[in-house]
């Protein structure tokens, strides 16, 4: 009985640690207005290969003075498997976990409420969105809906929409972890905040 109670308390503690983040959909270039009064941003990109012909894209830029998010750092991510090909077996990625640390909240979609994560579903590339974004400690796990899959021929696979968060910390390199159906989790070079 005591061990059952202990297990129950452990499960409750684990569940209490997981924190769902608020996700909103936005369009480009309108989202840029949160980060620059001119509604234009200059970005830097990092690419990490996935299964030879796919990649994880990390995008980073600093919000400009005079913008709602002035002084913060913007991090956007995208998984591109459009050219990952399978004939009898189509590989896919179900989630991406990044050691992000604390994120800053802003009104990304103009409804007056503060949000955690934005997904650029209009005005940009992609066809796969987010099912959820869940924080556990410093890690955030982004689960895709549906999974991001390769295709039966080049150009027939999926790409996620760009999805992003904001932090008060500048970037450093981290190893992101992508859960998939082809074997052990993929460990991918990415940018994320250099938080304490």
Which residues fall in each region the model found?
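N-terminal signal peptide c-region/cleavage motif recognized by signal peptidases
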Residues: 13-15
């Amino acid at each position: 009985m005591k061990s059952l109670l202990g297990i129950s308390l452990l499960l409750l503690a684990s569940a209490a640690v997981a924190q769902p983040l608020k996700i909103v959909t936005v369009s480009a270039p309108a989202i840029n207005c949160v980060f620059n009064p001119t509604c234009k941003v200059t970005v830097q990109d990092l690419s990490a290969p996935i299964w030879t012909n796919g990649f994880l894209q990390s995008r980073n830029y600093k919000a400009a003075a005079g913008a709602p998010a002035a002084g913060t750092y913007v991090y956007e991510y995208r998984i591109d498997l459009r050219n990952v090909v399978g004939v009898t077996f189509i590989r896919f990625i179900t989630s991406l976990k990044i050691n992000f640390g604390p994120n800053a909240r802003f009104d990304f979609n103009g409804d007056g409420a503060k949000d955690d994560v934005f997904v650029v579903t209009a005005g940009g590339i992609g066809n796969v969105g987010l099912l959820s974004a869940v924080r556990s400690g410093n890690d955030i796990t982004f689960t895709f809906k549906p999974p991001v899959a390769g295709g039966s021929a080049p150009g027939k696979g999926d790409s996620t929409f760009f999805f992003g968060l904001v932090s008060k910390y500048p970037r450093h390199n981290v190893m992101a972890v992508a859960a998939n159906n082809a074997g052990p989790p993929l460990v991918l070079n990415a940018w994320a905040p250099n938080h304490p």
